[in-house]
Swiss-Prot record:
Residues 63-83, 173-183 have a biased composition (Polar residues). This is Ninja-family protein 5. GO terms for biological process: negative regulation of DNA-templated transcription; signal transduction. Residues 1-159, 173-208 are annotated as: Disordered. It is found in: Nucleus. Belongs to the Ninja family. It comes from the Eukaryota. InterPro entries: Ninja_fam (IPR031307), Ninja_motif (IPR012463), NLS_NINJA_AFP-like (IPR032310), TDBD (IPR032308). The keyword Nucleus applies.
Amino acid sequence: MASRDFLGGFGRDGGQAPVGGAGAAPGPGGESDEIELSLGLSLGGCFGAEPSQEGRSADPRLQRSSSVASICSLPAATTGTSCGAQDAGPGPAAAPPPDLLRTSSLPAEYMEDRLRRRAMQSQRRLEAKRKRLERRNSMSSGRPVPAAGGRDDGLEHTVPSGFQLRRSVALTTAGSPTPSRPQQGPADRRAAEATGPDGAACHDEPQPLPLRLRTLRSLTMRTASTGDLRSAMAEDMPMVSYKAEGPGGRKTDGFLYKYRKGEEVRIVCVCHGSFLTPAEFVEHAGGGEVPNPLRHIVVNPQQSVFL
């Protein structure tokens, strides 16, 4: 009972407990203020009790404004005197609130510049891709790559391709005759450089430097690898031969074809290049049918048809 009186006195404006033991007291308007024991919160009032009706009407409320132009929740301004009394005559009509314009996050010019930059970047990518495709096609076909802007076309036509260099080096190493040039002295070389093919002096045009043949080492390595391959093939596929009996018997050569374990032996004849069995090889050489053809075939591992 004492706690109930204490809460009742704390919730009232006067802060005094009621004289009687009742939990509610009649107010000025005949209404009783009940004690609220919940932990509710009120704006501008006491804890545990709602504000009075007069205080609620006098309490200004916060008005929210909308960004949409057609909706406005602000109250219209009223005219009045300094003492709060209204004028006798009707006041002028309140002007409508100005339209609130909504703005975008980015201006239109920025979007246009951005789209323009994207278009330029895509165009540059397409141009670079087209150039790469042209360069790849020209390299695969063996034609010279077209010169870029600002480069001399005549200088590129004087440079031979890699295929031509390899072919010339192969012909030179094979023993093909090459035209010999007479040795020129330093004075003759300087005179030839000073005068052009038509006899006119040329000093401003730079002479292209001679290209060094860098394929000699590759050819040497290729020859060595080919020799190793031939020796390996001679070991795997030795030379065989068969000579028919009799004064007019002829000798037929071939090589033992590489075979796996469990497979039938095959001999390739040199004259026709046919794959034959040992019995067929003996018959092909003119020996006829023999009981053991492998005993009549001579194997010579020192010789090979590839050497």
